[in-house]
Curated annotation (Swiss-Prot):
CDD domains: RHOD_YbbB
Quaternary structure note: Monomer.
Record's catalysed reaction(s): 5-methylaminomethyl-2-thiouridine(34) in tRNA + selenophosphate + (2E)-geranyl diphosphate + H2O + H(+) = 5-methylaminomethyl-2-selenouridine(34) in tRNA + (2E)-thiogeraniol + phosphate + diphosphate; 5-methylaminomethyl-2-thiouridine(34) in tRNA + (2E)-geranyl diphosphate = 5-methylaminomethyl-S-(2E)-geranyl-thiouridine(34) in tRNA + diphosphate; 5-methylaminomethyl-S-(2E)-geranyl-thiouridine(34) in tRNA + selenophosphate + H(+) = 5-methylaminomethyl-2-(Se-phospho)selenouridine(34) in tRNA + (2E)-thiogeraniol; 5-methylaminomethyl-2-(Se-phospho)selenouridine(34) in tRNA + H2O = 5-methylaminomethyl-2-selenouridine(34) in tRNA + phosphate
UniProt record similarity statement: Belongs to the SelU family.
GO molecular function, one term: tRNA 2-selenouridine synthase activity
Residue span(s) of domain Rhodanese: 12-136
Listed SUPFAM superfamilies: Rhodanese/Cell cycle control phosphatase
Protein name per the record: tRNA 2-selenouridine synthase
Coiled coil ranges: none
InterPro entries, alphabetized: Rhodanese-like_dom, Rhodanese-like_dom_sf, SelU
Functional description taken from the UniProt entry: Involved in the post-transcriptional modification of the uridine at the wobble position (U34) of tRNA(Lys), tRNA(Glu) and tRNA(Gln). Catalyzes the conversion of 2-thiouridine (S2U-RNA) to 2-selenouridine (Se2U-RNA). Acts in a two-step process involving geranylation of 2-thiouridine (S2U) to S-geranyl-2-thiouridine (geS2U) and subsequent selenation of the latter derivative to 2-selenouridine (Se2U) in the tRNA chain.
Origin: domain of life: Bacteria
EC number: 2.9.1.3
């Protein structure tokens, strides 16, 4: 039998299959990428055992757990674990702290199914602690460069072409602006942290000593950046990306109209999907109504409605340029110009896509 492990680094670098025996409610609050939740106890069973533990102590709680998970219920859960173990012989199982739940699951697998399957010592809590420490170590030990630029310049496009780029928006599943929501929801905060940490771990293992991050607010939608990283981003050197106005409009059209519509229609079908997409686009504009001002919001909303009507009629998206262009020039550009001025002393390079890529791939990688 493979030994139980506490080598968290190897687990995450190797994308080891992980069998999570915590209750569904625990799993929903945060998990590791690719982990499969096959719980020892349901949420209701866990709640009953927890009450028993508080009122009568550990022995009584363990006895109740064995009564609740017995017979056909036990056989069904062991069968699910056995199927996972057979499909993923290189995997591991764990519970919250690496204690009784994973030990019981491990013992039942061995006794009932004849499968010796290793567990993670310390469980979810220890693995989560390791990942948070991974982020903190990177902030303390690595160099960071912030990639800035006006809305629509393609900062994310550049970032994804860099081996040492950390795509915070991808981990948050959000494009980082008032229009940044996707058709599907964002991960839990814990999931965001875990994804970012594993990305950092793998890139450092591949030899990265410096990272490039996109200029972001402290929150990307509902996901907050690690506090130490956000603090650092207020002092790290900045590389400023520039592009032409037509190219920026085209990129916004691609991301927030063409791609977003495609996401909704793929999930919900042409008719329902288009309706949900149109509602999302209108809501995104409404979210900044107060900052736009009443008259400007009404003007842009009317242009958006006209563009949506034309898109619904013949599939054309060109009319969306009529609201995208003034949204950039009248709202986003003045805001970003102010931010650029505030960062002026930290800007170490300015250029177009290829120039910025060449600079960030160079031996100095923007370190002052």
């Amino acid at each position: 039998m493979r030994a139980d492990t506490r080598d968290f680094r190897a687990l995450f670098l190797g994308d080891a299959p992980l069998l999570d025996t915590r209750a569904p409610v625990e799993f929903a609050k945060g998990a590791f990428p690719g982990a499969v939740n096959l719980p020892l106890m349901s949420d209701a069973e866990r709640h009953k055992v927890g009450l028993c533990y508080k009122q009568q102590g550990q022995d009584a709680a363990i006895a109740l757990g064995h009564r609740l998970v017995s017979g056909a219920v036990k056989a069904e859960r062991v069968a699910a674990w056995a199927a996972f173990a057979q499909a993923h012989p290189e995997g591991y199982l764990y519970c919250f702290r690496g204690g009784l739940r994973s030990q019981i699951s491990q013992a039942w697998l061995r006794e009932e199914a004849g499968i010796a399957y290793p567990r993670v010592i310390g469980g979810y809590k220890a693995m989560r602690g390791f990942l948070l420490e991974t982020i903190e170590q990177a902030i303390a030990e690595c160099g960071f460069v912030v990639l800035g630029g006006m809305t629509g310049t393609g900062k994310t496009d550049v970032l994804r072409q860099l081996d040492h780029g950390l795509d915070l928006e991808a981990h948050a599943h959000h494009r980082g602006s008032s229009f940044g929501k996707h058709a599907t929801g964002q991960p839990a905060q814990i999931d965001f942290d875990n994804r970012l940490a594993i990305d950092i771990l793998k890139k450092r293992a591949a030899g990265c000593r410096q990272f490039v991050v996109e200029d972001e607010s402290q929150a990307i939608g509902s996901c907050s950046l690690p506090f130490g990283l956000y603090q650092g981003m207020q002092r790290y050197p900045v590389v400023w990306l520039e592009d032409t106005q037509p190219a920026r409009v085209q990129r916004i059209l691609r991301d927030y109209v063409i791609d977003l519509c495609g996401e909704f229609t793929a999930l919900h079908g042409e008719q329902d999907g288009f309706g949900l997409y149109a509602a999302r686009l209108r809501q995104s504009l409404d979210n900044i109504a107060r900052r736009l001002g009443g008259e400007r919001h009404r003007r842009l909303a009317a242009l958006m409605d006209e563009a949506l009507a034309r898109q619904a009629g013949d599939g054309s998206v060109d009319a969306h340029r009529a609201w995208i262009e003034p949204l950039l020039t009248e709202y986003y550009d003045p805001m970003y110009a102010y931010q650029r001025q505030a960062k002026a002393a930290r800007i170490v390079f300015t250029g177009d896509h290829q120039e910025v890529l060449d600079y960030l791939r160079g031996p100095g990688r923007a370190l002052p």
